Amino acid sequence: MLKRLLSKLTGNRQQIEHHLKNQYQVEENGLSFPLSLVDDSQLWALASWLEQLAEEDYLISLTDRWLLSWDALYRLLEDEEHASSLPLIGVPDVLPLRASLSSRGALSDSDFRVWIAEWATLPARKPIRFSRTGAILTHENQQYLLSRENWALLQATEQLSAQKNQTPGETTNQLGWAAIRKCAKQAAAKFDDYLEKTHVVKPTSLSLRLRKATVADTAVIEIEPHFEDQPANWLGSFDKNSQVHDSYRIPGENGELSHVIIPPEVKEVLNSIHSIPSRRVAGSEALSFVRNPYTFLGEDAASVIAPEEHEQALFDARIFFHHFRLIPQLNAENKIAEVTLVLEPVSPVPQPEITFGFSAPRELDKFIQQLGISVAAQMPAGSWQGYELELSQFTEQQWHDCQALLTRWQQEIEGKEFSDVLDIAKYGDRVIGIGEFEKISSPWLTKAQSENWLPDDIDFSAFSVETLSGWQPENLHHFDELQERITQAEAVGETHITAPWNDSQLPLDAAKTFSKNWEKQQSTANESQGNVADKTARAVLKIEQNIEETAYIKQRRNSLLNARHAEPEIPLSLKEHIRLKDHQREGVAWLQQLFLRSPEETAGCLLADDMGLGKTLQILSFLVWFIEKFPQEPPSLIVAPVSLLDNWERELDNFFYTAGIPVLKLYGETIKAVKYPKQAIPAHLQSQGIKNLLKPGWQGEAKIILTTYETLRDQEFSLARQPWSIMVCDEAQKIKNPAALITHAANAVQARFKVACTGTPVENTLVDLWSLFDFAQPGLLGALNEFGKHYVRPIENEDGRDTERLESLRALIEPQTLRRTKEEVARDLPQKIEVESCKQLTLSGVQKQLYLSSVANWQQQQALSEGMQQAGTGMLGLLHRLKLICAHPAVVNPEPRFRDNSPKLNWLLKILAELKHTTKDKVIIFTELRDLQRELQHAIHQKFGFRPVIINGDTSTKSQSQNSRQRLIDDFQAQPGFGVIILSTVAVGFGVNVQKANHVIHFTRCWNPAKEDQATDRAYRIGQTKDVYVYYPTVKDTEITTFEETLDDLLQRRRALARDMLCATPDLSGADFEAILKGA
């Protein structure tokens, strides 16, 4: 189906298939391709693609051939990034078939058997006979491919037969029929009467349905376990039995019988739930369960219950944790008349605040006493009147403030006043009065913004301009209808569906790809936002400020801003050949100075240096210095995504002598040695919901402990009780969601100094920044609701950014934020030079003809759409097509005249030839278009005799893989002299550093200038010794303004605006391109 679609788009199906027919052999295990294809000049495109598939682990390399297994083939057919390449192998069309299943015996019988009795065509449902090799069947001398669902069904039936020969018995029959039934339902197969009424369910995951009630001011929560295809009467059997069984038989209506098989890991979680009387928890148990079910339900819960499922269950049950504050209401005599308790729900969706009024001190006293019980027990949460209170961030000072408020009110009622509360002489010599806090401002800071546009990973070219007419990304009704029509078509074997937005016919596979990308776009757009609420301003002690002039000097208590001007203390363990750059020395000194002022003057900081400036080395230098200077102090904790933890350990070994720096990896297999088995945890702790604990002394002699965010969440009772000197959260975007369990666990950890480390502190909204500072310096930015009203709304206002409010926020966080860009540290780096001459490439004649015909087609569609009030539709597909035409017209039309008249390709080959014969420098070519990648690879091979490596997001990252991403890059960098590597602009993530290349060619442009600069930074970073030359080849025309010319202008104007870390990245509007489309 995809082959027909793509051949239609290119218009060259017969020509392609003529050269490629019979280039594979059908085997039982898959399709095989001879390695000799590489030597056939007529088949270079196929050979190049097969090499790509081998690099991405689709193909198995054998001694004389490549093997594409059937499972890999089906994955490939669903991979939209390879969709345009499928005609290269000419896979047969899928033959829609419906299987009819028959059985013999019952599940309890030793001779129980299930087989496919008949195949019938769809939609005619006529019986059909055929021969088959693997997933390829032959009918009437024509080859077809089984659908993925029918192939899975066929394998499941064969697997049951094989298992019965090895381990016969009822359990084998049950598990085998469960697997077959699941595949049969997906394939819309037909069952005989016995199979229709016999269900087998083996749940591998659970969801929890929660119901909350308040009984005598105490929250009571009922827990109901649920799994997919759960029989209606299963929960009754679960509750009725005294223990959890390995299997259940649940009778149903009309003679149906369901077999439920419980795997060990699911049984362990169900045992925990079953041990709860009536499946109800109350009081402290309810708090522990709601806040973190993983510590309550045991070590297997994390693999059985998905975090998002639990968070959704809490939301559905309207169960929220609440930040709280006490607000005194003063009368005309400045005395307390009453106190209001304000509860702010922590939720990704804004919820109304809840308030309680205390009219007398005794009422407030009850609240403080109940709060004190939770605080004394060091519990991360408490409760009041059935509402859950978040205490992970509740400080000792806040506790004292609550007590002081009660004491003041009691004394006022008794007619007593503090005699010295307003006496300034009672305070330090820097205090000059009492009043509202005055925010610090800095006049040299400037406003900037960044913009983003269409997502690069959505390919709109699968549909024509007419097909996309009427499509609106925000129309979720159309999205739901599209998914429903896809499901219906799959069930009955239809090959096409009707588009909900204009009734055009869509190939099913292309529609599924489009739906998947549309869903990704919605998920990105719908990330959770913070709540917004008021917060009453409070009085503070005014102090002398040293911003505009030095108003107060006292050497033993310097301003936090002075920390930037200190000299670093370089750790003795730093290896002799390692020399810190100037900006790294400044960063280490800044961290050291802030730490020395903690905890009295600061609780933590945000290290937000630009990518490639060595944040890891700075933090490691800081940590090693601390270990050397304070050897008796508690250890330090580094929390990072699991993919980065090995890099932390590797860089520690590379840069430092680590003999005196013991490190513990608290994740993966190593955690088992220091973790209590569940049965060893005392019953009184388990009764309170504490079922995950580390053994006493688990940290050993370690001075640095590495762990994951997930371990931090699951082991919070141990990690939060351990005093830490320094806690580092790397890639701190992981704690940007205030409502996530991981964020709560991070905030619960007691550390003298916390460091949030991220190059992108604001990704989607300023709430990201609030959450980071809620970790590093709680209360600095106020309550989340206050922050939303005071900063997020005016700064992110669509009608215009409030620059005064933006600068106020910048000044507020400046003392605890360090952000340097490469421009600011250029003295320590080679130059980055943009080559302007390549921006004057002339659009070729045939290229211009193809360009104008595409625009004319779109303009004609616009004229037809205006009467339907749909003007502007289809623009996304057109813009993508214009991007392809400008880059290399042969990607749109492979006729020789288009390949021979490609100005950008001709320019590329010319500049590469100059570099090869002069400087012999290495070159990176960036483009995310896979078809274009192969065209460039082939052209370079034809010109220079070697095939440059291509690396995309799917290239393996496993270190043991022969074609791993890092190994390919290392090989490229190790080869002497001239070389070329082709990278995807949007796939250059962690670990892709190519400092040996110093020429960066953006053959196609990214819609986002920040991503484009990040791609360039793969070469322009610490370790680069040569000037880096950056090329943006652009085709122009004397009569029309081209797409590339307009895009280059937009990106250039936005590049400088994209550097402010406080600015989120809104999307560009398609209106920016309307002028060139209407004028072409």
Curated annotation (Swiss-Prot):
Where the record annotates domain Helicase ATP-binding, the positions are 596-779
What Gene Ontology terms describe what this protein does at the molecular function level? ATP binding; helicase activity; hydrolase activity
The cross-references to SMART domains, in alphabetical order and at most eight, read: DEXDc, HELICc
Q: Name one Pfam family in it.
A: SNF2-rel_dom
Q: Which UniProt keywords apply?
A: Antiviral defense, ATP-binding, Helicase, Hydrolase, Nucleotide-binding
Give the phenotype of cells or organisms lacking this gene.
When this gene is missing the Zorya system does not confer resistance to SECphi27 in E.coli.
What does the record give as the function of this protein? Component of antiviral defense system Zorya type I, composed of ZorA, ZorB, ZorC and ZorD. Expression of Zorya type I in E.coli (strain MG1655) confers 10,000-fold resistance to phage SECphi27, 100-fold resistance to lambda, and 10-fold resistance to T7. While most T7 infected Zorya-containing cells undergo abortive infection, a minority produce viable phage progeny. These eventually accumulate to a high multiplicity of infection, leading to culture collapse by 2 hours after initial infection. ZorA and ZorB probably assemble in the cell inner membrane and exert their effect there.
Provide the Helicase C-terminal domain boundaries.
904-1069
One GO term (biological process): defense response to virus
Q: What is this protein called?
A: Zorya protein ZorD
Q: Report if keyword ATP-binding is assigned.
A: yes
Q: Which InterPro entries match?
A: Helicase_ATP-bd (IPR014001), Helicase_C-like (IPR001650), P-loop_NTPase (IPR027417), SNF2-like_sf (IPR038718), SNF2/RAD54-like_C (IPR049730), SNF2_N (IPR000330), SNF2_RAD54_helicase_repair (IPR050496), ZorD-like_t1 (IPR049660)
